[in-house]
From Swiss-Prot:
MF annotations from Gene Ontology: 3-dehydroquinate dehydratase activity
Purpose: Involved in the third step of the chorismate pathway, which leads to the biosynthesis of aromatic amino acids. Catalyzes the cis-dehydration of 3-dehydroquinate (DHQ) and introduces the first double bond of the aromatic ring to yield 3-dehydroshikimate.
GO terms (BP aspect): 3,4-dihydroxybenzoate biosynthetic process; amino acid biosynthetic process; aromatic amino acid family biosynthetic process; chorismate biosynthetic process
Similarity-based family: Belongs to the type-I 3-dehydroquinase family.
InterPro entries assigned: Aldolase_TIM, DHquinase_I, Type-I_3-dehydroquinase
Known catalytic reactions: 3-dehydroquinate = 3-dehydroshikimate + H2O
Protein name, UniProt field: 3-dehydroquinate dehydratase
Active site (record annotation): H109, K134
Protein's organism: Methanoregula boonei (strain DSM 21154 / JCM 14090 / 6A8)
Enzyme class label: lyase
Amino acid sequence: MQIVASLTDPSQAATAQSQGADLLELRFDLMEGDPVDIARRCRAISKLPLIATFRSALEGGRYFGSPEEWAKKIAPVLPLVDYVDIEQQFARKSGLVREAGKAIIASHHTAEMLPLHVLFVLEQELRAYGDIPKIIVTPHNEDELIDLIAFTRAAKKPVCTGVMGSAFRYARAILPLFGSELAYCHAGVPAAEGQYSVAEFVALMKMLS
């Protein structure tokens, strides 16, 4: 399991590293300024691997562009990052990321909970173009959360699972115990509702281990 610090400002990189993050996610859709300059600033502050993300409005972010526009935005930052988050709607542009030798986090975020059989199909679809499938859903009751835990345990690895919102915030700490590869946290300002800070998550893992 690796801790990802989702940054909403490049100045948070130092805090994330000092608190114990393993990777830094650059949420370009939440940042002001040129993505290349932002990535360079983070490289100057920290040597941790970087994830480039333009989270679409459809999946909880603030990016509204087409796949073609997404490709134009991601191309200049490829020399500076190690991973690229690619939603399914942008999957046909994954070739340029592969050609650059970067790893792909193939992601899907939904405000609903998906049935178990759909989760397994989705995992295969994401793995078809990505190295790490990332599936973030929204359980509405404990039974649905148990299904998500069961999927996480049974799915092919590596896989990343998580929850949207704060209703089942504690699942963010539980899912890595059942095999989720990445745990997304914040380093000052949450990039998503319900995120723990890196420091909080490190403390939780120590208590649960």
